[in-house]
């Protein structure tokens, strides 16, 4: 098993257990404890895990972005449930904005089953996946984000998106506060989502429970600005909102 594959599997296991010992990871992966320790040291240096005496857990800091290959393992079962609920709100012939989040990628995996959908995305991974199927897909172009290698950002991306109007915008963020505000730590990605939100008739936020009751650096939007929030937890009591029907439990 290559180093990158080991690191992906470590993150996947920690996503399931929240906390694990070196011995547990060694046994589950059939890899020596010394190799596990080296991998954990590298992951900690990259800000992806927190080590303590005898154990390790995923870092919770919202100021750092976990690479897409690892984020796609985080809460993957919950994200797939959320994606199914989101896909049910997308209809034949819809034009769909997808952002570069791992949550939106799981929605992309379901779109080939919906007839006549057109997708506009700044996600390299989503565009690559959809290119294998009969789904009309437009990749925005732009600069590869230095922080999140899986998405395209910058002025060219924004100019492209401003010229397009969609039926649905599907997106996620890093943090959602109790007062209904959404946040992310990267200004470039916030700017892109702002255009998607503005130019879509219907807006869907994908929000697994790990994002709740948190804030990050840059304000993105408010629940008042969107039609649906889909989560793996019941949000009717989380938000003080007079329109609870916008919250969908996946």
Placement of each model-derived feature along the sequence:
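HTH-adjacent hinge/linker in prokaryotic transcriptional regulators
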Residues: 2-9, 13-28, 34-100, 108-116, ...
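Conserved SAM/SAH-binding loop
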Residues: 104
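Conserved phosphate- and dinucleotide-binding cores of soluble alpha/beta proteins
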Residues: 2-5, 12, 19-23, 30, ...
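Glycine- and other small-residue-rich loops at beta-strand/loop junctions that grip anionic moieties
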Residues: 75, 96, 119, 150, ...
């Amino acid at each position: 098993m290559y180093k990158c594959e080991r690191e992906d599997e470590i993150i996947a296991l920690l996503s399931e257990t929240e906390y694990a010992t070196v011995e547990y990871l060694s046994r589950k992966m059939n890899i020596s404890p010394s190799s596990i320790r080296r991998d954990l040291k590298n992951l900690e240096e990259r800000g992806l895990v927190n080590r303590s005496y005898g154990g390790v857990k995923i870092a919770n800091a919202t100021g750092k972005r976990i690479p897409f290959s690892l984020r796609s393992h985080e809460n993957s079962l919950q994200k797939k449930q959320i994606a199914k609920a989101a896909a049910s709100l997308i209809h034949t012939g819809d034009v769909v904005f997808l952002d570069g989040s791992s949550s939106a990628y799981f929605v992309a995996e379901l779109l080939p089953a919906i007839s006549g959908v057109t997708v506009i995305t700044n996600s390299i991974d989503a565009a690559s996946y959809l290119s294998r199927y009969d789904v009309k897909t437009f990749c925005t172009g732009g600069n590869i984000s230095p922080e999140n290698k899986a998405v395209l950002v910058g002025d060219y991306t924004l100019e492209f998106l401003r010229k397009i109007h969609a039926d649905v915008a599907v997106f996620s963020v890093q943090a959602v506060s109790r007062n209904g505000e959404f946040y992310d730590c990267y200004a470039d990605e916030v700017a892109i989502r702002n255009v998607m939100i503005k130019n879509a008739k219907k807006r869907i936020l994908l929000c697994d429970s790990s994002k709740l009751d948190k804030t990050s650096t840059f304000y993105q939007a408010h629940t008042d600005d969107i039609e649906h929030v889909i989560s793996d937890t019941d949000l009717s009591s989380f938000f003080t909102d007079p329109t609870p029907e916008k919250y969908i439990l996946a």
